[in-house]
């Protein structure tokens, strides 16, 4: 794929040299005619050179920066990057496409070295695997951390009464208050559960933050849904009456 994008970047130079070599043994009038044609060919090829080279650089940059939250996809992309950096890049250079091979190898290698720094500091290979500089760790399980608006650090995880989903993994627990999240990389923070929001379908949204949650408000619901929520809360409220025959002061 990379070779297909790069194969035409220097081909106009080969065409130019071929035309120049063939015009040496041609009559003066024919030579002028061939030179005019050569100039038109080289000019047309030169106009196409910059868009092709720009697309090639953008593609390699996209490949170096692309990230996914799916574990299997990340493994496949990482293997393709390693093959491109160690095999395709040198192969392009060996076949004479020096710019193509150098750009491919250099961009991917610089990105790998940059991520390897976070791998070395935090001793976790997931920085290279997920192609990101910030990860969140939930009881040893790593997942990409998506920075929220205004650079505030908080995490919301979806789950149930005794489990929550961490990326494509399921974390089971006894008490949600015992679950903590460690943010490592460009950001450094330790988060705990500050609120467990119960949804109408019985699922939960767990909010992790450094600041306590004061309250959660219902909004954007129809009156019928609000009435159903109030009815559910009334059913769950239990009032225990003390029998008159029991002496509470004893």
Curated annotation (Swiss-Prot):
Boundaries of every CoV 3a-like viroporin CD domain copy? 134-213
Organism, as annotated: Canine coronavirus (strain BGF10)
Which InterPro entries does the entry link to?
a/bCoV_VIROPORIN_3A-like_CD (IPR046446), a/bCoV_VIROPORIN_3A-like_TM (IPR046445), Coronavirus_Orf3a/b (IPR004293)
What membrane topology is given? Multi-pass membrane protein
Secretion signal: which residues?
Answer: none
Protein name in the entry: Non-structural protein 3b
- Give the CoV 3a-like viroporin TM domain ranges: 40-130
Which keywords has UniProt assigned to this entry? Host membrane, Membrane, Transmembrane, Transmembrane helix
């Amino acid at each position: 794929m990379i070779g297909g994008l790069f194969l035409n970047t220097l081909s106009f130079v080969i065409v130019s040299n071929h035309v120049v070599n063939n015009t040496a043994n041609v009559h003066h009038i024919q030579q002028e005619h061939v030179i005019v044609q050569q100039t038109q060919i080289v000019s047309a090829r030169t106009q196409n050179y910059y868009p092709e080279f720009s697309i090639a650089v953008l593609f390699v940059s996209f490949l170096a920066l692309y990230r996914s939250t799916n574990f299997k996809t990340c493994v496949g992309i990482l293997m393709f990057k390693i093959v491109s950096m160690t095999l395709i890049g040198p192969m392009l250079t060996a076949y004479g496409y020096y710019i193509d091979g150098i750009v491919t190898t250099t961009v991917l290698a610089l990105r790998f070295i940059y991520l390897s720094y976070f791998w070395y500091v935090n001793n976790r290979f997931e920085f290279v695997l997920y192609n990101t500089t910030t990860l969140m760790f939930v009881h040893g399980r790593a997942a990409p951390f998506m920075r929220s608006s205004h650079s505030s650090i908080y995490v919301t995880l979806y789950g149930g009464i005794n489990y929550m989903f961490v990326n494509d993994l399921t974390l089971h627990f006894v008490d949600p208050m015992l679950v903590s999240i460690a943010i490592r990389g460009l950001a450094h923070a330790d988060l705990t559960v500050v609120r467990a929001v119960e949804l109408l379908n019985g699922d939960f949204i767990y909010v992790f933050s450094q600041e306590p949650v004061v309250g959660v408000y219902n909004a954007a619901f129809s009156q019928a849904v609000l009435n159903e929520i109030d009815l559910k809360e009334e059913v769950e409220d239990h009032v225990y009456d003390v029998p008159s025959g029991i002496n509470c002061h004893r």
